[in-house]
Amino acid sequence: MAYNRINTLSTITATDQPQDTTWWREWYTLRWGRYYGTYKPGKYLLPCDDVECDRLDIMHKFFLVTRQHEMPNFGGLHSYPLPDQPKILDLGCGTGIWAIEMADRHGGRGRVEGWDLNMTQPESIPPNVSFHRRDYEDPWRDVEPNSFDIIHMRLLNGSVENWPRLYSQVFRHLKPGSGYLEQVEIDWRPQSDGDPRPLAESKLMEWSQKVHRGFARSGKKLEMDPNTKGILEDIGFTVEHKKIIIALNPWPELESKKEMARWFNLGLNQGLEAMTFQSVIHWLGYPEPEVRELIERVKEDMCKREWRTYCTMHVFLARRPLSPGRRA
């Protein structure tokens, strides 16, 4: 079943602003031609307009394709079996596409919640799905502990200030013995499977370094913490960690890898502005024209097959054991 997204804004330039701006100023602010949410300003660095929503849906398709090739369980949506009427929570749910597909997959049984700072989800949704404007780093005082079968996170790097605290809240609200956290992230630092010198001197590498510096300066690091598995284990989880190599363009020989690369290239291409404007213009102070020129050069570098460039996707499957955790 299709669910139309109808309550987001199309990207417009400053000269195209509507005459009556009161309707959108309560929810959005316009910067560099992109709309950003006004709830807890600065908490989330990416925009929330239609271009960004399309990008998130493209990335959802990328994740499904990748996991169907690399981890072919449950249509690529999740990894472990769930009960017949599962209780599901999606943190940073974005457009709500994962939550809605999870509800459809379970035939309307169980309950699915999605939390996000920005309400960019459809108004027409399955009856067992609900979306809430909420900061998942705030205390979960009104949420029943020991209640969720799965808590899902995807692409949250760059929006979390305190990972151990968030993981501890997740731990306390999963069902002991069966509930699990499923977290999917991308390490956005490009690497080369060939001669590393062209990539090291490229605009793509310059972009990555600047974006990571900007996110770090904002207090929300974009890079994958190499000790994530250890942090989860210290809290009490039993953890599986899988790494998947994702080419930036279809240079691999395997057709499955080529398909993954095409979707990844499309998603990253559409997301360059979103990842760059706040982090590099606002937090590092670079002028907008210079940043836009950098983005155009990055798009060229992303398509150079001879560089054999790739990023790494991380999947963490963290189950809460029946016995109490050590810290959470």
Residue ranges and their predicted role:
Residues 85-142, 150, 165:
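Class I SAM-dependent methyltransferase SAM/SAH-binding core
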Residues 158, 180-271:
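Conserved catalytic/acceptor-binding region of the Class I
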Residues 46, 72-82, 116, 189-191, ...:
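Short amphipathic alpha-helical segments embedded in low-complexity Lys/Glu-rich regions
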Residues 5-85:
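Class I SAM-dependent methyltransferase Rossmann-like catalytic core
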Residues 160-162:
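Short N-terminal helix/helix-N-cap motif within the alpha/beta-hydrolase-1
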